Protein backbone atom coordinates (compact mmCIF):
# COMPACT_ATOMS: atom_id res chain seq x y z
CA UNK A 1 0.00 0.00 0.00
CA UNK A 2 1.33 3.41 -0.85
CA UNK A 3 1.25 6.58 1.16
CA UNK A 4 -1.05 8.01 -1.49
CA UNK A 5 -3.99 5.94 -0.23
CA UNK A 6 -3.73 6.54 3.53
CA UNK A 7 -2.61 9.35 5.79
CA UNK A 8 -1.45 7.98 9.15
CA UNK A 9 -1.98 9.86 12.38
CA UNK A 10 -1.03 8.65 15.84
CA UNK A 11 -3.95 6.23 16.26
CA UNK A 12 -5.78 6.01 12.97
CA UNK A 13 -5.42 6.08 9.20
CA UNK A 14 -7.32 8.52 6.98
CA UNK A 15 -8.28 7.68 3.42
CA UNK A 16 -6.90 10.19 0.90
CA UNK A 17 -8.61 11.25 -2.31
CA UNK A 18 -6.62 9.83 -5.24
CA UNK A 19 -7.18 13.08 -7.17
CA UNK A 20 -6.32 15.88 -4.70
CA UNK A 21 -4.94 13.92 -1.68
CA UNK A 22 -7.55 15.55 0.57
CA UNK A 23 -9.01 13.58 3.48
CA UNK A 24 -12.61 14.83 3.40
CA UNK A 25 -14.29 11.93 1.63
CA UNK A 26 -18.00 11.20 2.07
CA UNK A 27 -19.38 7.70 1.50
CA UNK A 28 -22.66 7.59 -0.41
CA UNK A 29 -23.05 4.12 -1.98
CA UNK A 30 -21.87 0.57 -1.27
CA UNK A 31 -21.74 -2.62 -3.34
CA UNK A 32 -21.05 -6.03 -1.80
CA UNK A 33 -20.24 -9.08 -3.92
CA UNK A 34 -20.30 -12.49 -2.22
CA UNK A 35 -19.70 -15.76 -4.05
CA UNK A 36 -17.96 -19.12 -3.94
CA UNK A 37 -14.57 -19.08 -5.67
CA UNK A 38 -14.96 -18.68 -9.45
CA UNK A 39 -18.78 -18.89 -9.26
CA UNK A 40 -20.62 -17.03 -12.03
CA UNK A 41 -23.41 -16.00 -9.65
CA UNK A 42 -23.61 -15.10 -5.99
CA UNK A 43 -25.08 -12.37 -3.83
CA UNK A 44 -24.79 -8.77 -5.01
CA UNK A 45 -26.11 -6.15 -2.59
CA UNK A 46 -26.24 -2.44 -3.42
CA UNK A 47 -27.01 0.13 -0.71
CA UNK A 48 -27.58 3.60 -2.13
CA UNK A 49 -29.12 5.96 0.41
CA UNK A 50 -32.40 4.40 1.52
CA UNK A 51 -32.51 2.07 -1.51
CA UNK A 52 -31.31 -1.53 -1.23
CA UNK A 53 -31.05 -3.83 -4.26
CA UNK A 54 -30.21 -7.53 -4.11
CA UNK A 55 -29.50 -9.71 -7.14
CA UNK A 56 -27.32 -12.65 -8.21
CA UNK A 57 -25.18 -10.84 -10.82
CA UNK A 58 -21.41 -10.59 -10.37
CA UNK A 59 -21.16 -7.91 -13.07
CA UNK A 60 -19.02 -5.08 -11.73
CA UNK A 61 -17.31 -7.22 -9.07
CA UNK A 62 -13.81 -5.77 -8.62
CA UNK A 63 -12.48 -9.28 -7.89
CA UNK A 64 -12.09 -11.61 -10.86
CA UNK A 65 -12.52 -14.78 -8.79
CA UNK A 66 -13.78 -14.05 -5.27
CA UNK A 67 -15.65 -11.58 -3.09
CA UNK A 68 -15.36 -7.83 -3.55
CA UNK A 69 -16.52 -4.51 -2.14
CA UNK A 70 -16.98 -1.08 -3.68
CA UNK A 71 -17.38 2.06 -1.58
CA UNK A 72 -18.34 5.18 -3.52
CA UNK A 73 -17.20 8.60 -2.29
CA UNK A 74 -17.51 12.28 -3.05
CA UNK A 75 -14.58 14.53 -2.18
CA UNK A 76 -15.00 17.96 -0.59
CA UNK A 77 -11.61 19.10 -1.88
CA UNK A 78 -11.97 18.51 -5.60
CA UNK A 79 -15.56 17.30 -6.14
CA UNK A 80 -14.37 14.07 -7.79
CA UNK A 81 -16.15 10.76 -7.10
CA UNK A 82 -13.52 8.10 -6.35
CA UNK A 83 -14.52 4.49 -5.68
CA UNK A 84 -12.57 2.36 -3.21
CA UNK A 85 -12.22 -1.26 -4.32
CA UNK A 86 -11.52 -4.01 -1.77
CA UNK A 87 -10.60 -7.37 -3.24
CA UNK A 88 -8.91 -10.56 -2.13
CA UNK A 89 -6.61 -13.04 -3.80
CA UNK A 90 -4.96 -16.09 -2.21
CA UNK A 91 -5.50 -14.84 1.33
CA UNK A 92 -4.37 -11.28 0.67
CA UNK A 93 -6.65 -8.24 0.76
CA UNK A 94 -6.06 -5.41 -1.71
CA UNK A 95 -7.21 -1.77 -1.52
CA UNK A 96 -7.22 0.50 -4.54
CA UNK A 97 -9.09 3.47 -5.92
CA UNK A 98 -10.89 3.39 -9.23
Where are these regions (language model features)?
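Short, compact, well-ordered microdomains
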Residues: 62-98
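Short cysteine-rich clusters marking metal-coordination/redox-active sites
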Residues: 16-20, 75-78
Amino acid sequence: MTGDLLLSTSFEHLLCCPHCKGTYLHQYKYEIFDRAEDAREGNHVVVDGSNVTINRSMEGNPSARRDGLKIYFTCEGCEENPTLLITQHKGQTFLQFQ
